[in-house]
């Protein structure tokens, strides 16, 4: 999803789409926010009959090598939604700046209170996967469309009694 980018993102997506029919470009103009971009992608996954939708930002903070680890719990029926967690593994936390770790700790605590997912950590991590079955039950247009999207999505997942699993992935910045 190209959410109103002013760089060459749209052109790059279109180029990939010409070479690979599995790439389906979605463009927002103007920028509508991270939540709106994710919602557009989710709606397209449902419309195209996908079984699982994954979110991996284009800023190189999410290593594609960890995508199978996010998909497996859903494929195996152990989760409806999986999300990356940079905090579970001490070695993975080393790449996270101290100020970001502090802020993440506060947001994690507040999200646990709001969502009811007490075992969950690192709610700001956007490397996620969700079953399309779960998406079909969620009121996608009612979920906050801005930067707090992931936090609000967790609240909605709990309202709909969905199983959420954290998956250990390394923090990756500045690459």
Predicted regions and their residues:
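DNA-recognition element of transcription regulators
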Residues: 151
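Catalytic donor-sugar/metal-binding loop of nucleotide-sugar-dependent glycosyltransferases
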Residues: 118, 142-145, 154-172
């Amino acid at each position: 999803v190209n959410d109103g980018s002013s760089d060459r993102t749209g052109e790059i997506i279109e180029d990939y789409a010409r070479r690979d029919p599995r790439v389906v470009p979605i463009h927002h103009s103007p920028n509508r926010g991270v939540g709106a971009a994710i919602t557009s992608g989710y709606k397209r996954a449902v419309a195209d009959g996908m079984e699982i939708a994954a979110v991996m930002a284009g800023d190189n903070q999410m290593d594609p090598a960890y995508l199978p680890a996010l998909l497996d719990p859903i494929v195996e029926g152990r989760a409806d939604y999986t999300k990356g967690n940079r905090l579970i593994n001490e070695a993975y936390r080393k790449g996270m700046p101290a100020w970001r770790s502090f802020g993440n700790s506060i947001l994690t605590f507040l999200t646990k209170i709001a969502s009811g997912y007490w075992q969950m950590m690192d709610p700001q991590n956007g490397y996620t996967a969700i079953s399309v079955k779960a998406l079909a039950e969620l009121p996608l247009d009612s979920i906050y469309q801005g930067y707090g999207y992931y936090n609000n999505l967790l609240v909605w997942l709990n309202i709909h009694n969905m199983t959420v699993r954290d998956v250990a992935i390394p923090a990756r910045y500045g690459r």
